[in-house]
Amino acid sequence: MTAAASTLLLLPGTDLHVSRLCLGGNRFGSALDESESFALLDTFAELGGNFVDTALVYADWVPGVERSCSEHTLGRWLTTRDCRKAMVVATKGGHPDLAHPAGPRLDRASLRADAHASAENLGGAPIDLYYLHRDDPSRPIGDILDTMETLVDESVIRYYAASNFSADRLAAAAQYASASGIGGFVANQLEWSLAAPKADRVAPDLTYMDAGLLEFHRTHRLPVVPYSAQAKGYFEKSRSAGPIPQSVERYDTARNARTAQLLHRLADEYETDATALALRALIDCEIDIVPVVGCRTGEQLRRSWSCLDVSLSPSDSELLTSLTLSH
């Protein structure tokens, strides 16, 4: 199980060579049982994928499932397939306690506990890439980065990254890392797709790509690993007759409808589908972007993966890329 070299991206500041799509694992062990999860992971590896995303809390909100079932399921797959060295595993910690959501958990004790728990769930340390799942703006950024450096020094994790941080906090982290001579964040994960959600449908502790964040990434060249990169299937679902499904209602705007129409027209020309084109547009941006894709079946995954085979004309590439940068 090795990823094709032509589809790999070296994350700057690391030795991690990752596939241009990352497989999201939020359904592992819950909406997808273990057999279905293994089958999806097998398909991903066969296609050339090697970058998998999970989190300590994934599916902990689902009644009756194993706690941290996504990590546990991924860990069992890695062991069963004997492919740990071939994969780049990313997980996240520091999420507020779902049972008692009293606020952020980026204190040293909580981060250490989460990182060690994730390493055990995934089959052993070190974790390739460890995201801070939520920010705590009240905590000095240096305190957070110092904790992460300790985890690197102890070989619990190899590299660390941000998730749902503001541009100001990312800039402060970059400044602290430079002044301290440490690596700092090597990636940022936030919501980003060609379909911007309605402003009132973005939770206050989540982050969607905006002008300030985009300028930060342009300046600092920090890679983006966006979640909801397929807009939860909005572009395909919006083509169906009848009302917009509730699952994608947050994207039901006139702007997104126009984008969907354009994608469907181009998809017919390129003999692909709208979601694949939307992913291609992200990958073709001026900054390094590795979209996280969420799929239920191997066929859905193959359709998403087909974006890597799409070769857009310069004018179409410029047009679609402009849509990703104009929210």
PLM features: residue spans?
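Short, acidic/polar
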Residues: 32-44, 107-122, 171-175
